[in-house]
Design a protein with these regions (language model features):
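C-terminal catalytic histidine-bearing segment of alpha/beta-hydrolase fold enzymes
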Residues: 263-323
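Conserved alpha/beta-hydrolase "acid-adjacent" motif
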Residues: 255-264
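Short beta-strand element of the alpha/beta-hydrolase
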Residues: 96-104
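Short beta-strand/loop motif that positions the catalytic acidic residue
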Residues: 242, 248-250, 254
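N-terminal cap/lid segment of alpha/beta-hydrolase-fold proteins
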Residues: 25-93
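Catalytic nucleophile-loop/oxyanion-hole region of alpha/beta-hydrolase
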Residues: 110-120, 131-167, 298-305
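Primarily recognizes the serine-hydrolase "nucleophile elbow" in alpha/beta-hydrolase
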Residues: 151-215, 230
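Mobile cap/lid helix-loop segments that gate and shape the active-site cleft of serine hydrolases
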Residues: 64-70, 202-238
Length: 323
């Protein structure tokens, strides 16, 4: 019941925001299934058990966050701890792809509408099953977001046959893009390795303060991390020939996360002969995600459909080839 109340509360906030702005009423897509990643909370080292079989691992570190989540009118969620969960969205016409979706928010919040519900709305229209992760915020416990994403992969792999899934990729935005890139380079095994990656205006480099997004670096690693730790969590330094094929999208003039972050990851992929593509749009800035008119100003404006076409083509290329 608690997880249902959380989802309904976010939807109500979205509706209220639309009414206050005198915009057409927007009813956000609701998940078909919401699953707590740690049903017994972070204090118990246990994951999800179904039919007597454990299909995910436990929480590992406890991020120390207690009490209810805090959700603002834009659907940005803070204070995620025991309530870490996945929202599953099933398309009407599934094409065999699934995406583990990582909303951004500087590792301080999770952007559950713009980069969660709205993303799922478009992706399911393309036939993609979506597993959007409301991951634990690190609170200076750096391992917890990646642990949650890897458990989301384990959950989806366990249900792949049931859902008709042949490939599971990862997608992320800003700090969520950093998380998606980290999942693409620091995976634990074949189960947690993404089959493909989609990075939208991602934070990549954590080594250089003039390049990185300082809030993301601080939120994940703290104020004075070691050089080895910074290198480990700078995904461009962890790329190998086994890193998944990657789609990168960003705006040329991003004053929040400098575009050089994307360039560095793209160059690392090329250096290791990993298939990759990068799309740079002349407007949009940062954080445009999947917000769209008339419900919210669209930063991409006339390039929205260009982005959709580019991403749809990449996803189409991920479909199993007919023999």
């Amino acid at each position: 019941m608690k997880k249902i109340i959380i989802a309904l509360g976010i939807a109500a906030l979205c509706l209220a925001a639309c009414k206050q702005a005198k915009q057409p009423e927007y009813v956000p897509l609701q998940p078909d299934l919401t699953v707590l990643l740690y049903p017994q909370g972070q204090a118990v080292d246990a994951g999800i058990v179904e039919n007597g079989q454990q299909i995910t691992l436990g929480p590992g570190e406890d991020n120390g966050l207690r009490g209810p989540e805090v959700v603002n009118p834009n659907g940005n969620i803070a204070n995620i701890g025991d309530s870490a969960r996945v929202d599953i969205y099933f398309p009407k016409n599934p094409n065999g792809l699934c995406i583990v979706n990582c909303p951004g928010g500087g590792y301080q919040i999770v952007s559950s509408i713009n980069e969660g519900m709205c993303a799922a709305e478009w992706l399911t229209s393309q036939g993609v099953t979506v597993c959007s992760v409301n991951y634990r915020l690190p609170n200076f416990h750096r391992t917890v977001p990646l642990t949650d994403v890897q458990n989301a992969f384990r959950y989806c792999r366990a249900h792949a046959q049931e859902w008709g899934i042949s490939k599971i990729g990862v997608m992320g935005y800003s700090a969520g893009g950093h998380l998606a890139a980290t999942a693409s380079t620091l995976y634990a095994d074949d189960i947690t390795r993404p089959d493909f990656s989609v990075l939208i205006y991602p934070v990549i480099d954590l080594t250089t303060l003039s390049i990185t997004h300082v809030g993301t670096r601080h939120g994940l690693l703290g104020e004075i991390p070691s050089e080895d730790l910074v290198d480990l969590y700078s995904p461009q330094k962890q790329v190998t020939p086994e890193t998944p094929e990657t789609f990168i999208a960003l705006s040329a003039y991003d004053n929040v996360v400098p575009p050089v972050n994307s360039f560095m990851y793209f160059q690392a992929l090329q250096a290791h002969n990993v298939p990759c593509q990068m799309h740079i749009y002349p407007i949009g800035g940062h954080g445009w995600g999947f917000y769209h008119e008339p419900y919210h100003p669209d930063g991409l404006q006339q390039y929205r459909e260009v982005f959709y076409t580019d991403l749809a083509r990449f996803l189409q290329d991920q479909l199993p080839k007919a023999e």
